[in-house]
Amino acid sequence: MSWSLRVDKPDTGESPFKHSLVTGAQEIPISSFADKTFTAPAQIRNFCIIAHIDHGKSTLADRMLQLTGVVDERSMRAQYLDRMDIERERGITIKAQNVRLSWSVTAGGTTENYVLHLIDTPGHVDFTYEVSRALEACEGAVLLVDAVQGIEAQTLANLYLALERDLTIIPVLNKIDLPAADPDRYAAEIAHIIGYESGDVLRVSGKTGEGVSDLLDEVVRRVPHPQGDPDAPTRAMIFDSVYDIYRGVVTYVRVVDGKISPRERIAMMSTGATYELLEVGIVSPEPKASAGLGVGEVGYLITGVKDVRQSKVGDTVTTVRYGATEPLTGYREPKPMVYSGLYPVDSSDYPSLRDALGKLQLNDAALTYEPETSVALGVGYRCGFLGLLHIDITRERLEREFDLDLISTSPNVVYRVVTEDNTEIVVTNPSDWPEGKIRTVYEPVVKITIIAPSEFIGTIMELCQSRRGELGGMDYLSPERVELRYIMPLGEIIFDFFDSLKSRTRGYASLDYEEAGEQEAQLVKVDILLQGEAVDAFSAIVHKDSASAYGNKMTNKLKELIPRQQFEVPVQAAIGSKVIARENIRAIRKDVLSKCYGGDITRKRKLLEKQKEGKKRMKTIGRVEVPQEAFVAALSADAAGDKDKK
């Protein structure tokens, strides 16, 4: 077991590098085999765990940390590798983590020491790119499946990513200690999908630790050791980078060829930028500085850079002297799929929102933002995200970590509009929609995979067809479970598709999607008019067939939310100049006759005529003030899938 003297750290999700800076509080580890770097590649095994949300991946990682002795009982806490509070609360992993473990295997009377690099990956569909680059750093993958729920759509998507990279798959059933577990049924299902025998599927319990040591033995036995040339020019792949307030950007790499040593000058091959290496180290599971990294090893680099975007995930690191000329394959820029406006409820918070987004972007290279102004909501930012969970988590982090009150507008996808004069416009916001004649509109489409009990096939097909989905194929994984594949517009699934799917299948269906290009579509922009004036925050781009339903829904909602005025206010939904829905907010009638106790009828008539004239004048010059609460209620109930209904 590795002991270390250090300041004991409270569970706050704070920087793991903080204490390594304070003199006297520096870690003094009593070394284990894994603390020495430049291990022979034959003694290294790099593997990751692929699992759906809530299938016990982080709990299994906890047991591995305890079994291999890198975390003592005193320091142990649940979900040790999930450092953010939000990761623990939601039970999801957002940032991939890695840890270096030592493990001994006794065979034929001799004991061999091995170094295992465990790379913990996110399970959610929005973070597929995070998963794909974590897989690049491995030779093997543990396919972890809940023995109560069986294999889910996102696990299947990540499994295919692993198979594309020729990773060795070790199938494992978790949670076998639960009374509702059905390991035999799901072992047969997994074996059917990946072409193994059901006897090859290991059975473990992350909670009790049963079967975990056998799993580590299997990792050593089945996963191939890393291949690479120690004498070739240095090439290392970045699979993650995080911003640390004490040390700047910490870049996690896997060395493919050559070696990395401290105080060398390194270069990023995608940008050509060069930096001096201040520190090279390993994570076990707290960071420890080392003498360098050799072939197949996983560790971190610190260069003192302050912006994560200069250390791009998937990029190749090489040395300036005798550097490599060919980068490793597979690098791509993460690009936003969904856009949404974020506005502070109190406009004086705008500078705080700008600073907060800047800090979040240090840790999240996929987040993009640019200033925008809305007549209704004031100044804010148009932000680009990977998907709905990404929006949700970013907004929650802004509200929690930076204490901001925000309104987010309905999410939008990126449309490509070609006008009559062949001008091409990229639209990420309804206010960018061109006026005048439009020749064609292209919208992004996705391939979606749904896995659900076979009894729900009818209701799922009905839902997908109502969202303009085209059936691509259907397979039975077992007599009870079916996989459906559809091509569907991304704009149709970013609202409330996932919630509708869950409610129609009693929560049993799981969903995964991936980009599949674009298609022509008959889309229109629906404006909501109050008193004849368009309110930009309520505009939306919808399909022609569902425009009138959207118009009716919004006009009804606003009729309830906007307070009555002294004059009648029409609430209209319009496509261009054509009104497609209308509701009236009735006027408040002030009783002008209350002071007349009797007397002549002409006196009363005169007062009523005067009131009528005043209302007429008010109607021509009066402006309708929409209260902030009405915006919040209309947008939050409309956007992101009616989350309040959950």
Swiss-Prot record:
SUPFAM superfamilies cross-referenced by the UniProt entry: EF-G C-terminal domain-like (SSF54980), P-loop containing nucleoside triphosphate hydrolases (SSF52540), Translation proteins (SSF50447)
Q: Where in the cell is it found?
A: Cell membrane
Q: How does it sit in the membrane?
A: Peripheral membrane protein
The signal sequence is none
GO MF, one term, reads: ribosome binding
Which residues does the record give as GTP binding sites?
A: D54, H55, G56, K57, S58, T59, N174, K175, I176, D177
Main enzyme class = hydrolase
Pfam (any one): EFG_C
Q: Which UniProt keywords apply?
A: Cell membrane, GTP-binding, Hydrolase, Membrane, Nucleotide-binding, Protein biosynthesis
| InterPro entries referenced in this protein's UniProt entry, alphabetically | EF-4, EFG_III/V, EFG_V-like, G_TR_CS, LepA_C_sf, LepA_CTD, LepA_IV, P-loop_NTPase
Listed under catalytic activity are: GTP + H2O = GDP + phosphate + H(+)
Q: What is its EC number?
A: 3.6.5.n1
Keyword Protein biosynthesis applies: yes
Kindly indicate whether the keyword Cell membrane belongs to this entry.
yes
Query: Quick one: a GO cellular component term?
Result: plasma membrane
Where does the tr-type G domain start and stop, copy by copy?
Answer: 42-227
What biological function has been recorded for the protein in this entry? Required for accurate and efficient protein synthesis under certain stress conditions. May act as a fidelity factor of the translation reaction, by catalyzing a one-codon backward translocation of tRNAs on improperly translocated ribosomes. Back-translocation proceeds from a post-translocation (POST) complex to a pre-translocation (PRE) complex, thus giving elongation factor G a second chance to translocate the tRNAs correctly. Binds to ribosomes in a GTP-dependent manner.
Record PANTHER family: TRANSLATION FACTOR GUF1 HOMOLOG, CHLOROPLASTIC, TRANSLATION FACTOR GUF1-RELATED
What further note is attached to this protein's record? Answer: The overproduction of this protein is lethal to M.leprae.
HAMAP family per the UniProt record, alphabetical:
LepA (MF_00071)
Q: What is this protein called?
A: Elongation factor 4
From which source organism is this entry?
A: Mycobacterium leprae (strain TN)
Name of the gene encoding the protein in the UniProt record:
lepA
